[in-house]
């Protein structure tokens, strides 16, 4: 399994304790990295690649979203790759940053009738794929990214977030 050095920062919001977020995130992102290495032949280029996770609130992510994407509203997750990478290529030692907003995550989980942890898992996987160059701007890119998310989540015992299919 690939080693990830995950730095956690709880900036704002009613998040679980930092040590719980750390161990939870390690399980999720190690599974995603292992999947990409084995199934997509996109391994990390270093023994221990680094990324940071920022757990924050809607107010903070709204400001980040406005500054970096020109959208003056909160969103669930934002990813900032350290370096440009395209799907199928190996990322460098520094992967980048993933920022998750608590209120949006909780609201979406309730609307989707999904457990908070399941939706957080999905958003972490989604953000992680962005660090590897995957995107969802074009329909074909979105379909590929959704398939990858679904397969990674299935490995973690979670159902398809885009449908009602049970885990494979």
Swiss-Prot record:
Cofactor note: Binds 1 zinc ion.
Cofactor: Zn(2+)
SUPFAM superfamilies: Metalloproteases ('zincins'), catalytic domain
UniProt-recorded Gene Ontology molecular function terms: metalloendopeptidase activity; RNA endonuclease activity; zinc ion binding
Binding site for Zn(2+): 126, 130, 136
Predominant location: cytoplasm
Function: Single strand-specific metallo-endoribonuclease involved in late-stage 70S ribosome quality control and in maturation of the 3' terminus of the 16S rRNA.
Family per record: Belongs to the endoribonuclease YbeY family.
Descriptive protein name: Endoribonuclease YbeY
Top-level taxonomy: Bacteria, Pseudomonadati, Pseudomonadota, Alphaproteobacteria, Hyphomicrobiales
């Amino acid at each position: 399994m690939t080693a990830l050095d995950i730095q956690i920062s709880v900036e704002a919001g009613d998040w679980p304790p930092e040590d719980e977020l750390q161990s939870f995130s390690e399980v999720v992102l190690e599974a995603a990295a292992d999947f990409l290495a084995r199934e997509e032949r996109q391994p990390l280029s270093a023994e221990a690649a680094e990324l940071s996770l920022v757990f924050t609130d809607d107010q903070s992510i709204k400001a980040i979203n406005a500054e970096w994407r020109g959208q003056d509203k909160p969103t669930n997750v934002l990813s900032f790759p350290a370096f440009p990478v395209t799907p199928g290529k190996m990322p460098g030692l520094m992967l980048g940053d993933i920022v998750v907003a608590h209120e949006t995550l909780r609201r979406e989980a309730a609307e989707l009738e999904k457990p908070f942890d399941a939706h957080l898992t999905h958003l972490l996987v989604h953000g992680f794929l962005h660090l590897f160059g995957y995107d969802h701007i074009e329909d074909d890119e979105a379909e590929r990214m959704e398939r990858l998310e679904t397969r990674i989540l299935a490995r973690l015992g979670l159902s398809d977030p885009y449908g009602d299919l049970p885990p494979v």
